[in-house]
């Protein structure tokens, strides 16, 4: 487990941005039963946590994508973190809506993006990647050259891996579901039986918790 992955996992559990409830699961809008609920918007209210996030993402971009010219935040939860990362890297910032505005100029992208500029897109959470990939299409249509998509946390689902591979876009996250449940067990947030159930969910989220 990398130091930053463990730090972010601990942060998310401590501020209750992530709740684990394998014995009393949540129901997603899609109808899927889930033992985890994530609200990374809470991170903006904790200066130390948001600094860990901004510095962690900035370090990855400097190391892996040094040619990056623009940071793009995905509306709305990705915007504040993208702004802090852009500030650390002294790079331009844009943000991208899931769809164009239905009034005014009808823009989907706010800020200045020049054709050919190299972009790293940032969001708070990756489940299957559907919303951020829609935003990525808008950036590409505007001439942006997307280097990667980054996030604070990923559920590390096979569906996301497949979707990003199909889009030919690299994906990185500071922490992920396997790392988080490992940290949760070490800190006694969950017991061994709950850990086993949490592992099972990630292997087959659509059928986990479904009884005949």
Swiss-Prot record:
Family under the similarity heading: Belongs to the purine/pyrimidine phosphoribosyltransferase family. PyrE subfamily.
Q: Which residues bind orotate?
A: 127
Q: Which residues bind 5-phospho-alpha-D-ribose 1-diphosphate?
A: 97, 101, 103, 123-131
Q: What is this protein called?
A: Orotate phosphoribosyltransferase
- Lineage, highest ranks first: Bacteria, Bacillati, Bacillota, Bacilli, Lactobacillales
Q: Which cofactor does it need?
A: Mg(2+)
Catalysed reactions, as listed in the record: orotidine 5'-phosphate + diphosphate = orotate + 5-phospho-alpha-D-ribose 1-diphosphate
Pathway membership: Pyrimidine metabolism; UMP biosynthesis via de novo pathway; UMP from orotate: step 1/2
Q: How does it assemble?
A: Homodimer.
**Origin superkingdom:** Bacteria
Keyword set, alphabetical order: Glycosyltransferase, Magnesium, Pyrimidine biosynthesis, Transferase
Under the heading NCBIfam families, the entry gives: pyrE
The protein's role, per its UniProt record = Catalyzes the transfer of a ribosyl phosphate group from 5-phosphoribose 1-diphosphate to orotate, leading to the formation of orotidine monophosphate (OMP).
**EC class of the enzyme, as a word:** transferase
Q: Which organism is it from?
A: Lactiplantibacillus plantarum (strain ATCC BAA-793 / NCIMB 8826 / WCFS1) (Lactobacillus plantarum)
**What residue intervals traverse the membrane?**
none
Known EC number: 2.4.2.10
One Pfam short name: Pribosyltran
Gene Ontology molecular functions = magnesium ion binding; orotate phosphoribosyltransferase activity
* InterPro entries given in the database record: OPRT (IPR023031), Or_phspho_trans_dom (IPR004467), PRibTrfase_dom (IPR000836), PRTase-like (IPR029057)
């Amino acid at each position: 487990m990398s130091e930053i992955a463990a730090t972010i996992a601990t942060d998310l559990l401590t501020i209750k941005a992530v709740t684990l409830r394998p014995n009393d699961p949540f129901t997603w809008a899609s109808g899927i039963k889930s033992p985890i609920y994530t609200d990374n918007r809470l991170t903006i209210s904790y200066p130390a946590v948001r600094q860990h996030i901004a510095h962690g993402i900035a370090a990855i971009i400097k190391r892996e994508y040094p040619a990056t010219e623009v940071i793009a935040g995905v509306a709305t939860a990705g915007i504040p973190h993208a702004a802090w990362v852009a500030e650390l890297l002294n790079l331009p910032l844009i943000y991208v809506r899931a769809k164009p505005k239905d009034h005014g100029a009808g823009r989907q992208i706010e800020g200045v993006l020049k054709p050919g500029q190299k972009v790293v897109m940032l969001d708070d959470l990756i489940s299957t990647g559907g919303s951020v990939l829609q935003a990525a299409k808008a950036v590409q249509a505007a001439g942006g050259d997307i280097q990667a998509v980054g996030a604070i946390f990923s559920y590390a689902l096979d569906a996301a891996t497949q979707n990003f591979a199909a889009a030919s876009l690299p994906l990185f996250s500071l922490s992920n579901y396997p790392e988080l449940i490992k940290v949760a067990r070490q800190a006694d947030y969950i017991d061994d039986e709950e850990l086993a159930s949490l592992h099972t969910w990630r292997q087959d989220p659509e059928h986990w918790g479904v009884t005949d």
